[in-house]
């Protein structure tokens, strides 16, 4: 369960909004995004009846818990994501749907979206933002632009192009 959290600008507790989930190729980990809160989570689902939170990082979001990445304050929250076939790299984008982006994250109009790499430990669990990787779509020549979904050349955990 993702608990609602209090927010000073909301009259009700801020709900968690998950728009995607992904299971690693070895069926050990489940990943989910929490678009409004701003976090990505990794759960060990070896026992699917008792998932264990093994990793959590914040990227943007409305709770103000996210650090800057490469000196950039992330606009939006974690939305679509792709996991490498070896389970070591999770690529996360920050635009859900432009109408919703504009409502909840109006700063994304000027800043644009980003794609961030999260380094994952596929053996012991755990996640950390890679401080050396960011694609800043706000700096595009005709931008600022937003990024919704990325595909991994050669295959990822949610497509069958690697077969």
Which sequence ranges carry the predicted segments?
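Surface-exposed loop and turn segments in beta-propeller and other repeat-based domains
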Residues: 1-13, 54-73, 130-163
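Beta-rich, blade/repeat-based domains predominating
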Residues: 2-25, 73-83
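Short coil/turn segments that connect the beta-strands within blades of beta-propeller domains
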Residues: 26-28, 86-88
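Short loop/turn segments immediately following the C-termini of beta-strands
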Residues: 35, 95
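Structural signal for beta-propeller blades
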Residues: 38-40, 99-100, 115
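Short loop/turn segments immediately following beta-strands, especially the blade-tip
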Residues: 42-54, 105-107, 117-129
């Amino acid at each position: 369960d993702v608990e609602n959290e209090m927010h000073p600008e909301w009259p009700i507790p801020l709900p968690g909004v998950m728009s995607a989930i992904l299971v690693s190729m070895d069926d050990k980990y489940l990943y989910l995004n929490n678009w409004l809160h701003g976090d990505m989570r990794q759960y060990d689902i070896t026992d699917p009846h008792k998932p264990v939170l093994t990793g959590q990082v914040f990227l943007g979001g409305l709770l103000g818990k996210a650090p800057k990445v490469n000196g950039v304050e992330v606009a939006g929250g974690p939305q679509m994501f792709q996991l490498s076939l070896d389970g070591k790299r999770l690529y996360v984008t920050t635009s859900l749907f432009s109408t919703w982006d504009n409502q909840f994250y109006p700063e994304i109009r000027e800043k644009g979206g980003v794609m961030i790499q999260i380094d994952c430990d596929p053996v012991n669990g755990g996640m950390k933002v890679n401080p050396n990787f960011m694609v800043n779509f706000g700096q595009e020549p005709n931008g600022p632009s937003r990024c919704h979904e990325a595909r991994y050349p050669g295959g990822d955990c949610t497509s069958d192009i690697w077969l």
